[in-house]
């Protein structure tokens, strides 16, 4: 069905090539859903009571069943809750869920979950005049910062900053800023509120429940008794009926909100306007229009003229969060592979019509089921696309990729947005599916972040030092000794004198014998062990070089000749190294492959190299590269 959020699609915009997108706005009471079939075309809106369903996945399944939609590849949820990492536990309802586990359970390629106020903020640039009402004067300045307030059960605060051709939404807890009264009536309100709370924030008096606080404070001033069952809804009803105390309370509420909105405007420089959402103000109607809101908004002394030019709007769109979450999802999908026209998803769409019918089936599989392409062997990919294996390879090369492996890497890069970038905590009661997925996702996320932030110039320097070393010693204490032993096992195949020490006394004794041309690779999660640092100082003073595999800005990283920084979430020394150990092992693999490439014979002698490798010539670096599982010798045999 058509809804109030439906907007005119861009000229020439067709349906989403990857199918309809599921949009959701989930609050503490209701879960609202819609389908976006093409940019700006949002329909099939349905509302479900949260209390009727045990969790998010169940209510989404019900919506998909009710709308009789075949498959959804991409979905986005705006939720009335902070979103930090993979695990979401609603504060105003008893739902708790893992984003990634829910995505897998529903079979989505993408499931994006954002704070509902962030989604509302992203909707603002697309609102039409029919979806907002201006209160007071002022003229909106294009391409300027926009502010947003949302008095509801709490007080949401956000802002939008223009950045080239897009907007950046600010996360904020501005509603918890300290309330400061501006007149005698507000002094009375503050005195009353202080008896209830040690810290009185604007949220206490300018959100929905604040109307009741104000009403009871002013009733105390007038020595009037207020029944216990009088709440905000009843007070607003009385104000509309003309009861003096209720009308005064609503006006004080609007004045406080005006002060707060003015604070946000001058703080953000919101020349693009201040928007008011939430469930309270739109229901006040003429009470708000006639209130002291705008007068108090402008009452900033020397900045009164500044604020007179800033417009204020009340959002009247029925489902504005759908517009915002749609914009966030669209940007997320666009940014999967850099957002440029050469991005792998966009390139597939652009080239699809020029492909052969068989290659087109592979393209459709990649667009609709990208994880299947990434995870499956070529025989399964060919079977699912109903093509031959050579057709899969031809498709990859038609996109400019060297082969299937190269295409999988580029496709995986485009999908990293669905992998949590924050550490997901394992909780008591998690099923094996949940905690297993969290451990794997945390590890994958850490490796992807390492790939993005690793200084490859430092990697090159470290490889050069190792390749030219007279002797290499690997030092690691405790859990890091596992990494040192693994490195020793790999590097001794290069014919360089190599050893690993996990005992501090052996490290000290050996380091005293090192000198120019020798290299120590020190592996440490904390990078702060004073005994290890003293040992390395002795070796470096004698001319040895030190490669550190550790966290950034640690004493070890600062001392080392070359630091390979592997930052991770395990920041407390009391935590067992799990993710950090994996990252350290990955760094050793990178260094070993790099040295193998440096020491490999010229490509013209590959045939001879393969022959030597078959004869067990382990000292040949090309054979070692193959032994490390990253080389080409094995493929040359096949």
UniProtKB/Swiss-Prot annotation:
Span list, region Glucokinase: 1-341
Q: DNA-binding residues per UniProt?
A: 378-397
> Is Membrane found in the keyword set?
no
Q: Which cysteines are joined by disulfide bonds?
A: none
Region annotation (Putative HTH-type transcriptional regulator) ranges: 342-638
Give one GO molecular function term: DNA-binding transcription factor activity
**So where does ATP get bound?**
24-29
| Region annotation (Disordered) ranges | 1-20
**Which reaction is the catalytic activity of this chain?**
D-glucose + ATP = D-glucose 6-phosphate + ADP + H(+)
| Alphabetized UniProt keyword annotations | ATP-binding, Cytoplasm, DNA-binding, Glycolysis, Kinase, Multifunctional enzyme, Nucleotide-binding, Transcription, Transcription regulation, Transferase
Task: Give any Pfam family that matches.
Answer: Glucokinase
Q: Where is the HTH rpiR-type domain?
A: 342-418
Q: Does the keyword Cytoplasm apply?
A: yes
According to the UniProt record, what class of enzyme is this?
transferase
What does the entry list under GO cellular component? cytosol
Q: Name any Gene Ontology BP term.
A: glycolytic process
Q: Residue limits of the SIS domain? A: 462-601
Where does this polypeptide localize?
Cytoplasm
Note the PROSITE patterns from the entry: HTH_LACI_1, HTH_RPIR, SIS
What's the EC number here?
2.7.1.2
Similarity comment text for this entry: In the N-terminal section; belongs to the bacterial glucokinase family.
Name of the protein: Bifunctional protein glk
């Amino acid at each position: 069905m058509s809804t109030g959020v439906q907007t005119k699609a861009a000229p020439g915009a067709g349906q989403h090539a990857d199918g309809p997108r599921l949009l959701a706005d989930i609050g503490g009471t209701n879960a609202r859903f819609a389908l976006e079939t093409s940019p700006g075309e949002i329909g099939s809106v349905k509302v479900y009571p949260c209390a009727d369903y045990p969790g998010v996945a169940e209510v989404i399944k019900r919506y998909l069943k009710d709308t009789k939609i075949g498959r959804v590849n991409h979905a986005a949820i705006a939720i009335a809750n902070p979103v930090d990492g993979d695990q979401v536990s609603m504060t105003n309802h008893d739902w708790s869920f893992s984003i990634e586990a829910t995505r897998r359970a529903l079979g989505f390629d993408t499931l994006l979950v954002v704070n509902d106020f962030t989604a509302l903020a992203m909707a603002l640039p697309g609102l039409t005049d029919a979806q907002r009402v201006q209160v007071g004067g002022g003229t909106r300045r294009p391409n300027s910062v926009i502010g947003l307030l949302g008095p509801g059960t709490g007080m949401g605060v956000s802002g939008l900053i223009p950045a080239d051709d897009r907007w950046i939404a600010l996360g904020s807890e501005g509603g918890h800023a300290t309330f400061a009264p501006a007149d005698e009536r507000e002094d009375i309100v503050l005195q009353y509120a202080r008896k209830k709370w040690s810290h009185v924030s604007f949220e206490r008096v300018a959100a929905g429940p604040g109307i009741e606080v104000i009403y009871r404070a002013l009733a105390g001033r007038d020595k009037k008794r207020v029944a216990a069952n009088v709440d905000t809804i009843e007070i607003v009803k009385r104000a509309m009926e003309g009861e003096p105390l209720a009308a005064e309370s609503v006006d004080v509420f609007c004045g406080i909100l005006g002060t707060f909105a003015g604070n946000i405007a001058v703080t953000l420089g919101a020349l693009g306007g201040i928007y008011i959402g939430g469930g309270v103000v739109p229901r006040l109607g003429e009470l708000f229009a006639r209130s002291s809101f705008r007068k108090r908004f402008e009452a900033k002394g020397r900045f009164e003229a500044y604020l007179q030019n800033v417009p204020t709007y009340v959002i009247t769109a029925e489902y504005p969060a759908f517009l915002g979450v749609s914009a966030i999802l669209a940007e997320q999908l666009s940014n999967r592979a850099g957002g440029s026209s050469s991005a792998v998803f966009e390139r597939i769409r652009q080239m699809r019509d020029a492909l052969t019918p068989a290659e087109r089936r592979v393209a459709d599989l990649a667009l609709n089921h990208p994880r299947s392409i990434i995870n499956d062997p070529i025989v399964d990919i060919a079977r699912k696309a109903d093509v031959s294996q050579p057709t899969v390879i031809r498709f990859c090369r038609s996109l400019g990729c060297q082969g299937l492996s190269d295409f999988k890497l580029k496709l995986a890069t485009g999908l990293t947005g669905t992998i949590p970038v924050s550490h997901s905590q394992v909780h008591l009661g998690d099923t094996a599916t949940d905690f297993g997925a969290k451990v794997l996702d945390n590890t994958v996320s850490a490796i992807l972040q390492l790939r993005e932030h690793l200084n490859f110039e430092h990697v090159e320097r470290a490889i050069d030092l190792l390749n030219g070393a007279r002797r290499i010693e690997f030092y690691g204490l405790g859990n890091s000794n596992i990494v040192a032993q693994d490195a020793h096992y790999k590097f001794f195949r290069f014919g360089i004198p190599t050893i690993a020490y996990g005992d501090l006394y052996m490290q000290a004794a050996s380091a005293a014998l090192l000198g120019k041309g020798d290299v120590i690779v020190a592996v440490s999660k904390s990078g702060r062990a004073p005994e290890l640092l003293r040992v390395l100082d002795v070796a470096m003073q004698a001319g040895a070089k030190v490669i550190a595999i550790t966290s950034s800005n640690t004493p070890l990283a600062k001392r080392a000749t070359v630091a390979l920084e592997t930052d991770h979430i395990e920041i407390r020394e009391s935590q067992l190294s799990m993710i950090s150990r994996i990252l350290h092992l990955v760094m050793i693999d990178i260094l070993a492959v790099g040295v193998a490439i440096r020491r490999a014979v010229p490509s013209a002698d590959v045939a001879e190299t393969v022959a030597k490798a078959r004869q067990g010539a382990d000292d040949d670096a090309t054979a070692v590269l193959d032994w490390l599982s990253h080389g080409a010798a094995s493929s040359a045999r096949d």
